[in-house]
């Protein structure tokens, strides 16, 4: 904990701009109840009753009203931050809110009141055990949710669903560790611990539960992060038309002139609540046009960063030499969907053919469609969800972040090594115990039991001020 984590702080807690209601929030830290009484008198002209809504004037330094509204006082520890908290709910004009904020700073100067940093209220809720770290992150995720599914999943994380699953796993690991440590402490008993305590069975159960939690976390991360989809191919194969068809709007210019798109056009759409970040790129070809060359170089940069590449071809000609040269340059490890567009000119029906192989970079499927008529667009959407790993009905999962996935995978690896040591019976019991300890440490990092101040600084700096 930093020394400044106990400073009294204040901030405007509502979004910038005009609105019906604006909120100024104070969390009084070490200044405590004495500051709460003094600020109640100075700002509202009255002593605020705990947990009661009081309709009062908000006073300036001369005792004149700046505004009138609702004042709320939450004594510690029964508040969002776990500290003494005052909230002033007035009208949402930016000028009156700035005046009220400055008045709070002036009135609280003797108590060391300062402006809050981004995420500092939620950081204090974490430090004062009102939220664990996964729940604190869910606050920001709920605010930033881009779909109903993401909002509901963030709400479940905030309610503690993710944390409860993690704590249950940790409890099981601790219980198994206790048995192992007891056996290491009393080797003279000569008991076959692994058999007597069914350690292998207990470990298998923990690994199975962890795999389930990791699967749910992957779904939640997909809701939060989405999928980057790059449209690539030669000029005039219908990339811009496909972007417009997927987005349901005319976002990109479509002409019969090759090379119309010279720079990327990006649009985020949603499919079943999953954000798809679709990028239409310049057509890939040999050219002497310097501007087009820059666009083509950027196209390859986007392809390198993509989660999925849609390789567009003209259904009339199929895969030609130029297309083969493009396909050969696609990076390993990036799924490629071969899209044969313009089926309206061939008379062929829309269809999907699964072609996935075992190579590091393989065409996972082939979709025949008409971007112009919309035939087969739903088939393509379905394939994108399948490639992303989205499971129908997975909206009940909790929202997760990349750091959670990293920690879960690391814990999974430690438990896998523990299982290997278990096969060596008592000869590797100390290594078995160590892998359990490391798995527990990685799981605890998710909820914040073992977390550095540097990581906390990064996490909470991404919040808005006043939250």
UniProtKB/Swiss-Prot annotation:
UniProt-recorded name of the protein: tRNA modification GTPase MnmE
Gene Ontology cellular component list: cytosol
Domain TrmE-type G: 226-389
Alphabetized UniProt keyword annotations: Cytoplasm, GTP-binding, Hydrolase, Magnesium, Metal-binding, Nucleotide-binding, Potassium, tRNA processing
Required co-factors: K(+)
Function per UniProt: Exhibits a very high intrinsic GTPase hydrolysis rate. Involved in the addition of a carboxymethylaminomethyl (cmnm) group at the wobble position (U34) of certain tRNAs, forming tRNA-cmnm(5)s(2)U34.
Protein residues bound to Mg(2+): 240, 261
Subcellular location: Cytoplasm
Binding-site residues for K(+), renumbered to this chain: 236, 255, 257, 260
Gene3D superfamilies the record matches: P-loop containing nucleotide triphosphate hydrolases, Probable tRNA modification gtpase trme, domain 1, tRNA modification GTPase MnmE domain 2
Organism: Burkholderia pseudomallei (strain 1710b)
